[in-house]
Regions:
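Acidic/polar-rich alpha-helix caps and helix-coil junctions
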Residues: 1-270
Length: 270
């Protein structure tokens, strides 16, 4: 990893995420790529996933990596104006579903809901649109899926840009495991043992059922690119979600000769 130190080498990423300057967001296609907790895609799951007509249902029973990468939906009351830290629960139980969940799977100073901007002002809800923002221009997106993978509240962020000192991973074990899985699949050597050494270790911490190699066939995901074998499609999916927001996707699409994927019409939360 790359170490940062106050007064020596600093950066501005974790502050930027909590400002109106951030334009990092995801598409519906990216959100749909995350599996449900039963290890099935959204097209064939039997979990409590509720479809894409309601964002609470859309995020329900999903891979925890989705919640830690793209801010889950919530809503709170702001009774003293937008530029304050105070908040209260609404009378709708759904509005706190993911507030409660994130309190159990995250730390005190990262990925807790409701989110706040760099000055500590509580954001009223997600999805939070740049053009419809309750007077709060921060932590917002154009299409409703705000990426907050690098969000935390323990980094100094209130006074100036470029003073953050959170260290930056350069090569982490998750990348090693998805590299191994893809290489084994391309060599036609990806079996259950290979899955257990790689993908299933990643899924264990993401609250997703294990990959069972023999269960993956052409019917596993009806929305699969038909030119990609079913097992390779699932291995590539795992790589996509594990490394989401870390700068790998475009190079991967070039390597796979799948540049046409970027021509899809981007869709948002609604």
């Amino acid at each position: 990893y790359k170490a940062y130190e106050t007064g020596q080498l600093m950066h501005g990423l974790t502050r930027m995420v909590r400002t109106g300057e951030s334009y990092i967001e995801a598409t519906k296609d990216a959100v749909d790529s995350y599996l449900c907790t039963d290890g099935r895609p959204v097209s064939t799951t039997t979990s409590r996933y509720g479809g894409d007509k309601n964002m609470y249902g859309q995020f329900r029973d999903r891979d925890y990596r989705l919640y830690l990468t793209i801010c889950p939906p919530y809503m709170v009351k702001k009774e003293n104006g937008p530029s304050t830290a105070d908040w209260k629960y609404t009378d709708n139980a759904q509005d706190r579903e993911f507030i409660d969940l994130m309190a159990t799977i995250s730390g005190e100073t990262y990925h807790r809901l409701p989110s706040s901007n760099f000055k500590g002002f509580t954001v009223q809800g997600q999805p939070h649109f740049k053009n419809m923002n309750w007077g709060q221009g921060w932590n917002a997106s154009q299409m409703g899926f705000w990426v907050w993978k690098y969000y935390n509240t323990h980094t100094v962020a209130t006074n100036a840009n470029g003073v953050n000192t959170t260290d930056a991973p350069l090569f982490r074990i998750g990348e090693v495991m998805v590299n191994y899985a893809e290489a084994m699949c391309e060599l036609n050597k990806f079996d259950q043992a290979a899955a257990d050494k790689s993908i299933n270790k990643l899924r264990a911490r993401a609250n997703v059922a294990k990959m069972v190699v023999n269960d993956i066939n052409d019917a596993f995901d009806p929305k699969r690119d038909p030119s990609v074998p079913a097992l390779l499609w699932e291995v590539r999916r795992e790589r996509r979600v594990e490394l989401m927001g870390e700068g790998f996707r475009l190079d991967d699409l070039r390597r796979w000769k799948k540049g046409d994927y970027v021509n899809k019409q981007p869709l948002g939360a609604y």
